Amino acid sequence: MQARFHPIWVQLPSKLQDALLPYAGNDDFPAMLTAEQAKSIKKACGFDDNTLAVALLPLAAASSLTPISHFNVGAIARGESGNLYFGANMEFAGVPLQQTIHAEQCAITHAWLLGEKRLASVTVNYSPCGHCRQFMNELNSGTQLEIHLPKQASSTLDHYLPDSFGPNDLGITTLLMDPVNHGYKLETTDKLVLTALDAANQSYAPYSNSYSGTALLGKDGIIYPGRYAENAAFNPSLPPLQAALILMNISGGDCLAIERAVLVEGKHSDLSQRSATQSILAALGCSKFDYYTF
């Protein structure tokens, strides 16, 4: 079992420990459960979907990186596939607070990067902040996305974000998590660059058309892709580096052990991720940064 889960594990109900151990007990546990694994755990514990998601929140929060607030938040995104994806808040010392990743963003992006096509629900320790409500409003689940909190009645996003402004108001029909391929190409055989290019081709930027993707090579040899996720309200947009850091951290990697990073974006885009990406990477101790444009 990964060390980050040890402190919280003993606090879980024994029945849940027994049901989870075959999956979470492995060092390569990817902080997600397949639909079949979730079904097995629900049967063993007598849980329904919502009860299981709430029970998993402490385990999800164990992946938080909070050097500034020391306040850990966990989230579980349930895909329409039945898969459960963990999420946790992430902070980075030495960079502006605006670069913080919220637990809901983490869980949603985790699901998106692993190929989930639509979410059924998001479960979180605390009521979603306005930033996250607006971020979720970009999803193809729409305002009927279910939001679950411990010891509270379930509601939909429409309840948390009434009279919302979102992609529909701007005539956007392809939404976040809808499968896309923008078709950009680069002449290279560099695996890390090709991974970043693939991420850019699956990125979501309907407002600026500034598609971008990153790829991080961890010192453990694992490659982590990240896609840009734009938002109708602009500020809640998630940069591609943060998406890659989400996958790196939630998968058990070390965000302070990045061997090399690549950013790929359009040469004539209205905005660029380059300077912000370099700045954050420097704060994380990564100096090997390559930049490519299509």
Curated annotation (Swiss-Prot):
The keyword Metal-binding applies. This enzyme scavenges exogenous and endogenous cytidine and 2'-deoxycytidine for UMP synthesis. SUPFAM superfamilies: Cytidine deaminase-like (SSF53927). Keywords: Hydrolase, Metal-binding, Zinc. Binds 1 zinc ion. GO terms for cellular component: cytosol. GO terms for biological process: cytidine deamination. Homodimer. Zn(2+) binds at residues 102, 129, 132. Substrate binds at residues 89-91. The active site is at residue 104. Disulfide bonds: none annotated. It catalyses: cytidine + H2O + H(+) = uridine + NH4(+); 2'-deoxycytidine + H2O + H(+) = 2'-deoxyuridine + NH4(+). This is Cytidine deaminase. It is an enzyme of class 3 (hydrolase). Belongs to the cytidine and deoxycytidylate deaminase family. GO terms for molecular function: cytidine deaminase activity; identical protein binding; zinc ion binding.
